[in-house]
């Protein structure tokens, strides 16, 4: 998003696979100085009834420029047989704000590494997530918030509801 531009409508990105498919999508979101946007990324398995298989190895990179605001929403809704590996990184500059919300609903196994680097003075990050699992699903999350500049603020809140023999590893 160019400097000074405010996008009123959300930008929607969908990564979908058929049964047995592979996805290696890479999402790059860059907001220039004083820009504002909302981005929704979604993953899904198509043409199945919840038991499709596949493999996803994807990345998300976010750069929030000086005085910019990004509202980022990730919805992971793979079928129960998909293996999901993701690397997510955000860099937040001076007086910029990131509101990042994640929902983990599907997959057989999810391995997610999420880093937020607050590199500018007064940079701010609010990271929220929710997980709902069942059966033998296993979700593994590793989150880091790096306060690299003075007067930065980050807030991290994840909640999970697990059923059956599913597991969540932090």
Please tell me what each predicted stretch does.
Residues 1-170:
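Conserved beta-strand/loop scaffold segments within soluble protein domains that form the structured core
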């Amino acid at each position: 998003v160019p400097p000074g531009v405010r996008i009123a409508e959300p930008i929607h990105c969908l990564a979908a696979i058929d049964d047995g498919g592979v996805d290696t999508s890479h999402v790059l979101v860059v907001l220039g100085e004083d820009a504002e946007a909302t981005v929704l990324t979604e993953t899904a398995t198509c043409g199945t009834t919840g038991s499709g298989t596949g493999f996803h190895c994807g990345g998300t990179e976010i750069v929030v420029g000086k005085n910019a605001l990004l509202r980022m929403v990730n919805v992971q809704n793979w079928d129960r047989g998909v293996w999901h590996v993701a690397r997510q990184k955000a860099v937040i500059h001076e007086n910029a704000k990131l509101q990042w919300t994640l929902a983990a609903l599907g997959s057989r196994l999810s391995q997610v590494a999420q880093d937020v680097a607050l590199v500018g003075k007064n940079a701010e990050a609010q990271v929220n997530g929710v997980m709902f699992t069942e059966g033998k699903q296993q979700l593994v999350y590793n989150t880091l918030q790096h306060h690299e500049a003075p007067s930065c603020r980050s807030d991290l809140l994840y909640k999970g509801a697990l059923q059956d023999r599913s597991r969540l590893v932090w």
